[in-house]
Amino acid sequence: IYIKDKMVCDIVKSGFVDLGVVGSDRIHEGNFENRIVKIKTLSKISWPLVIAIPLDSSIKSMSDIKTIATQFPKSVNSYLDSVDLREKIRIIKIQGSAEAMPYGKWLGKRIDAIADISITGKSLRNNSLIRLGKPIAVFHPVIIANKKSIKLKNKMAYYRQFIKK
């Protein structure tokens, strides 16, 4: 069945389907790491999570940023923890087009930067944004399974013949 990527983990976890393919970002952001089983990472495909700032911004490094708008707060916080900046940068969780956020205020707060998926950079360029440094995370498609289904040997043996290809 074809469904929105936001729903794949929930539907697999519920047992409605045995297997699904979803981005590792959805697994991480939705806290599904312990609620589904990762069968295989399809590592030939990837998409980077980047920090982007307006072209005319005075920001030179991550330590200059006060606020970041993103659909990926857990991933951004993981990165900020790794560079010891989590306490200094406020994360604002948004849904939808992050690219417009640095050009206005969100609930009265100025947004310094965004964290968003950028494969080609075209959307960033179209919105006069530039990447700040290297990607902070890289995501991949993952084949996932329902925890109960994985225990059924006949069923998983059947699926494995397709997964190996």
Label for each model-derived stretch:
Residues 1-165:
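Domain-level signature for soluble enzymes in the chorismate/prephenate branch of the shikimate pathway
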